[in-house]
Design a protein with these regions (language model features):
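A generic "folded-domain core" signal
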Residues: 21-166
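Sec-dependent signal peptide recognition
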Residues: 2-10
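N-terminal signal peptide c-region/cleavage motif recognized by signal peptidases
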Residues: 16-18
Length: 166
């Protein structure tokens, strides 16, 4: 009986350490942005992330909204911009804008991405210059959601994530 308990404890410890290895670890907090690193089966993943400063409407039930820029060197991916608004998206309904600049995102379930590398580069340039960003989307039921993001701290979080995965 004791051997069985020790074996089960050993298995639990191994799985616990495995889960902890995949948990993102903060590499810096910069005003409204934070950078993270995590280890995956395909290598290191680094990202800058922000939560919205304002979400509307309050009546729509949804999970957390987040805006990301991700680096996955093991998969040769850099500057990947993605958004989740905490709900499944109606197809082709996600836009992000700052001032007169507006970008349309491709969506799948509850995540949205820009369509090509050049758009991502241009969008990141906008994020570095902007003070705020507004993300609008529609739920699969047709309700419009709006999330406001502050860009304060973005450049430092972005640079930290990029450097961590270099």
């Amino acid at each position: 009986m004791l051997v069985k308990k020790i074996l089960l404890l050993g298995i639990f410890v191994i799985f616990s350490f495995n889960a902890l290895a995949n948990t993102p670890r903060s590499t810096g907090k910069y005003k409204n942005w934070e950078s993270f690193v995590a280890e995956t089966e395909k290598g290191k993943i680094c990202f800058a992330q922000s939560l919205p400063t304002k979400r509307a409407p309050k009546a729509v039930q949804r999970d957390k909204s987040k805006l990301f820029v991700t680096f996955r060197p093991g998969e040769n991916i850099k500057d990947e911009v993605s958004i989740t608004s905490g709900h499944d998206y109606k197809s082709s309904s996600v836009t992000a804008s700052s001032g007169k600049k507006k970008y349309s995102f491709f969506s799948q379930k509850n995540f949205a991405w820009l369509l090509d590398d050049q758009e991502e580069k241009n969008f990141i340039k906008l994020m570095k210059r902007a003070t705020d960003l507004i993300v609008k989307a529609r739920t699969t039921k047709g309700a419009e959601t709006t999330d406001h993001y502050s860009m304060m701290g973005f450049t430092k979080a972005y640079n930290t994530a990029k450097k961590t995965c270099s």
